[in-house]
Amino acid sequence: MTSIAKAFVEKAISNNPVTVFSKSFCPFCKAAKNTLTKYSAPYKAYELDKIENGSDIQAYLHEKTKQSTVPSIFFRNQFIGGNSDLNKLRSSGTLTKMIAELKENKSSIL
């Protein structure tokens, strides 16, 4: 893990309402991005298999979140988990509320 990877992740999650660290070939990543698109979530996806330092970024994400797989999804600076966690939020109705709060620029998301 490099300080470049740490800086990249921290800047990404600070600058985007929703950040998804993904891999282009991952079906769970695709499903998560499809869900976020369906709910009109303002998200930015970073394809770790397509960007420089992708493996270092994934190593830092593992250190930060204790999750070694992708997708890694953040709402503002709050790690919410992967696709199954996103689906739990969707099923409970919480995802709709979280996205509405993001769009209203509320600072409290969860």
Curated annotation (Swiss-Prot):
Cellular component annotations (GO), alphabetically ordered: cytoplasm; mitochondrion; nucleus
GO MF term (any one): protein-disulfide reductase activity
Keyword set includes Disulfide bond: yes
Superkingdom, taxonomy of origin: Eukaryota
Record-linked CDD domains: GRX_GRXh_1_2_like
NCBIfam families named in the record: GRX_euk
Family: Belongs to the glutaredoxin family.
Function comment: The disulfide bond functions as an electron carrier in the glutathione-dependent synthesis of deoxyribonucleotides by the enzyme ribonucleotide reductase. In addition, it is also involved in reducing some disulfides in a coupled system with glutathione reductase. Thioltransferase catalyzes cellular thiol-disulfide transhydrogenation reactions. It transfers reducing equivalents to cytosolic protein and nonprotein disulfides.
PANTHER family tied to this protein: GLUTAREDOXIN 2, GLUTAREDOXIN-2
Name the record gives this protein: Glutaredoxin-2
Lineage of producing organism: Eukaryota, Fungi, Dikarya, Ascomycota, Taphrinomycotina
